[in-house]
């Protein structure tokens, strides 16, 4: 942040809750400096209490920002300005002295692995936005912990925001309030500054009573200074700064420096009928079913899946060499459309109370509605779309925004893992990569080695989704499902992953790749998915146990004939599901080669190049 005077005399904001004197010195300096800059009317230091939460909700209801959903217990609906509905990659930047610290310099064109901004350009952008940006509003001070308070893997942040929606959502998504300040003491914290960019009095009327400033939106990360600065958007991924900004972009950089991993992964526990349990982590791009897998009800008798987290994993090898993982979040910020009793019954149970919905449709009896909810409507019940218009099922436009969300406490999930808040984390024995591939990629394969597994992660591709602003059904590269979230140069990130193999005593997890989404020539899915995916997890479980249930192919190990339990499944065309076509894979390798050469260029680690050449070689001999 540009230099500020920290004399504490130049702001007249009235502290309406908490006291500046009670803050640790560095936190106080951070608050006062930014109060002076942003000029809020009031300062509210959040305590995280139930009572405070109730007041915030009542205040937002009064302002018309949220409505109560009378069908459920303490559930609320926010409708945003239609210009503020998703993460905006084009306005999300990382500021470092050298461009190459943030992204590899591509062979041609622009980097797709992050956006760099120079310190000078950022200073200009900052000074054009923040002075006076909170006039007439309250600056909320949110002390929050990513990870269970007191866990050696947890990290603390302080977010300053002028949005009560952010405060309410952060109370669900993180551990937040006075207890965090007590745990922090004089320790280090990540500085997070957020403003909707609408000082009062307003220059122009709000849409849906939703404050945002789309023309000037900017989400900036300053990893060297441990700062996140976000302006102009109230939407979750841009404003709940603990989520992608801190837990992935800043944390991945901390992880590189400190020798751990911050990843876009779910964490689940799977227990076999004998009561033996293993934990797996899985990286899929947004909207490829991370939440559904993390909360799965297995169809296999006697198997059990429990959820540790559905989106982000922080992982570190312990002294015994086990890779230990925590979920740094405290809630789920899930995509609503497609969530139903059939696709994710546990998510449906989780969101019945204490949940904030954003940009879903509302039924006239005070319920929520979205595409794929699969709920019959009672006679006479009508639907109001996310655009606040009456909606009928035959309408062209969707009733809920494709990236509409539920924000709900993780503790309410009926299958939350008993160890989900364990301070030391859970031991990860398998890592799964996957994406949405309609053609060519088999249901499951296992990497040949750690190095090959890292290459498989680097080569991930998937059909584009709604969580970003891209449109259309293109197959996009999304290495490690981290493409929008890398906090530093992807070439260096690959080197960091590869370096895990050289850790003394490290028990490296097996690495797998899955594709639930392969289709036949009529465009029908070849695999039923959802709870049936437990059959694939069962095979992985056996492989981790050392079962001889795999055969070698040019792309990796696949299940031997009859090694995948298909008992009770209807017609599944196993040959088509596992078919590996030379022609397809020659093209695939070409694509991967071109992408890595162009995008990672001089920063591509030699081991990845070697894996690519070896794969080419194996395919050419098919």
Swiss-Prot record:
Source species, domain of life: Eukaryota
Co-factor remark: Binds 1 Mn(2+) ion per subunit.
A Pfam cross-reference name: PEPCK_N
Principal location: cytoplasm
Record's keyword annotation contains Membrane: no
Claim: rRNA processing is one of the keywords in the record: no
List of residues that carry N6-acetyllysine: 70-71, 91, 473, 521, 524, 594
GO CC annotations on file: cytoplasm; cytosol; endoplasmic reticulum; mitochondrion
Modification comment: Acetylated. Lysine acetylation by p300/EP300 is increased on high glucose conditions and promotes ubiquitination by UBR5; acetylation is enhanced in the presence of BAG6. Deacetylated by SIRT2. Deacetylation of Lys-91 is carried out by SIRT1 and depends on PCK1 phosphorylation levels.
Mutation effect (residue 90 to A): Decreased phosphorylation and increased acetylation levels
Stretches that traverse the bilayer: none
Subcellular locations according to the entry: Cytoplasm, Cytosol; Endoplasmic reticulum
Active site residues according to the UniProt entry: 288
Inducing factors: Regulated by cAMP, dexamethasone, glucagon and by insulin. Dexamthasone, glucagon and cAMP increase levels, insulin decreases levels.
Region described as Omega-loop: spans on this chain: 457-487
Modified sites of kind Phosphothreonine: 178
Alphabetical list of PROSITE patterns matching this protein: PEPCK_GTP
Enzyme Commission code(s) on record: 4.1.1.32, 2.7.11.-
Gene3D superfamilies found in the cross-reference section: 3.90.228.20, Phosphoenolpyruvate Carboxykinase, domain 1, Phosphoenolpyruvate Carboxykinase, domain 2
Names of required cofactors: Mn(2+)
Keywords linked to the UniProt accession: Acetylation, Cytoplasm, Decarboxylase, Endoplasmic reticulum, Gluconeogenesis, GTP-binding, Kinase, Lyase, Manganese, Metal-binding, Nucleotide-binding, Phosphoprotein, Transferase, Ubl conjugation
Additional comment: In eukaryotes there are two isozymes: a cytoplasmic one and a mitochondrial one.
Family the entry assigns: Belongs to the phosphoenolpyruvate carboxykinase [GTP] family.
Protein's recorded name: Phosphoenolpyruvate carboxykinase, cytosolic [GTP]
């Amino acid at each position: 942040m540009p230099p500020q005077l920290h004399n504490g005399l130049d702001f007249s904001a009235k502290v309406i809750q908490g006291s500046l004197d009670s803050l640790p010195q560095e936190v106080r300096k951070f608050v006062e400096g930014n109060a002076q800059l942003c000029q809020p009317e009031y300062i509210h230091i959040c305590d995280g209490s139930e009572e405070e939460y109730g007041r915030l909700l009542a205040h937002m209801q009064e302002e018309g920002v949220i409505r109560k959903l009378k069908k459920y217990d303490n559930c609320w609906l926010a409708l945003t300005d239609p210009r503020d509905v998703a993460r905006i990659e084009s306005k999300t930047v990382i500021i470092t002295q050298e461009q190459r610290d943030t992204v590899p310099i591509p062979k041609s064109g622009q980097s797709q692995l992050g956006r760099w901004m120079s310190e000078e350009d950022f200073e200009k952008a900052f000074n054009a936005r923040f002075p006076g940006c909170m006039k007439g509003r309250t600056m909320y001070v949110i002390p929050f912990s990513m990870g269970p308070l007191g866990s050696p893997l947890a990290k603390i942040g302080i977010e300053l925001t002028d949005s009560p929606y952010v405060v309410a959502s952060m109370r669900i998504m993180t551990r937040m309030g006075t207890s965090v300040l007590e745990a922090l003491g004089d320790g280090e914290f990540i500085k997070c500054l957020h403003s909707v960019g609408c000082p009062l009095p307003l220059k122009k009327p709000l849409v849906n009573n939703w404050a945002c400033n789309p023309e000037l939106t900017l989400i900036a990360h300053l990893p060297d200074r441990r700062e996140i600065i976000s302006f102009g958007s109230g939407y979750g991924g841009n404003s709940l700064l603990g989520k992608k900004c801190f837990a992935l972009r800043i944390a991945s950089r901390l992880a590189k420096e400190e020798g751990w991993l911050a990843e876009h992964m779910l964490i689940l526990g799977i227990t076999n009928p004998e009561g033996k349990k293993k934990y797996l982590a899985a990286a899929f791009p947004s909207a490829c079913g991370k939440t559904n897998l993390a909360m799965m009800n297995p169809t296999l008798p006697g198997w059990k899946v429990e959820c540790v987290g559905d989106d982000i994993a922080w992982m570190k090898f312990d002294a015994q060499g086990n890779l230990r993982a925590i979920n740094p979040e405290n809630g789920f910020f899930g995509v609503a459309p497609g969530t139903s009793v059939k696709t994710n019954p546990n998510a449906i149970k989780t969101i019945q109370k204490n949940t904030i919905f954003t940009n879903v449709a509302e039924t006239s009896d005070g319920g929520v509605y979205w595409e794929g909810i699969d709920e019959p409507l009672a006679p006479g019940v009508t639907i109001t779309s996310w655009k606040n218009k009456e909606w009928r099922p035959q309408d062209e436009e969707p009733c809920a925004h494709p990236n509409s969300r539920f924000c709900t406490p993780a503790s309410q999930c009926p299958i939350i893992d008993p160890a989900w808040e364990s301070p030391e984390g859970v031991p990860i024995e398998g890592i799964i990569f996957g994406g949405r591939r309609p053609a060519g990629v088999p249901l499951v394969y296992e990497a040949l080695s750690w190095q090959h597994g890292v290459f498989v992660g680097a080569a991930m591709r998937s059909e584009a989704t709604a969580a970003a602003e891209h449109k259309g059904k293109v197959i996009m590269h999304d290495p490690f499902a981290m493409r929008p979230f890398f906090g530093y140069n992807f070439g260096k990130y690959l080197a960091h992953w590869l370096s895990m193999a050289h850790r003394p005593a490290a028990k490296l997890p097996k690495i797998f790749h899955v594709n639930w989404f392969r289709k036949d020539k009529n465009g029908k899915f070849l695999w039923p998915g959802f709870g049936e995916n437990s059959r694939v997890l069962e095979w992985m479980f056996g492989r981790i146990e050392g079962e001889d249930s795999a055969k070698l192919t040019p792309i990796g190990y696949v299940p031997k004939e009859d090694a995948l339990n298909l008992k009770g499944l209807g017609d599944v065309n196993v040959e088509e599901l596992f078919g590996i076509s030379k022609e397809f894979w020659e093209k695939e390798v070409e694509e991967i080669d071109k992408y890595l050469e162009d995008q990672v260029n001089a920063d591509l680690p030699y081991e990845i190049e070697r894996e690519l050449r070896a794969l080419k070689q194996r395919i050419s001999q098919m």
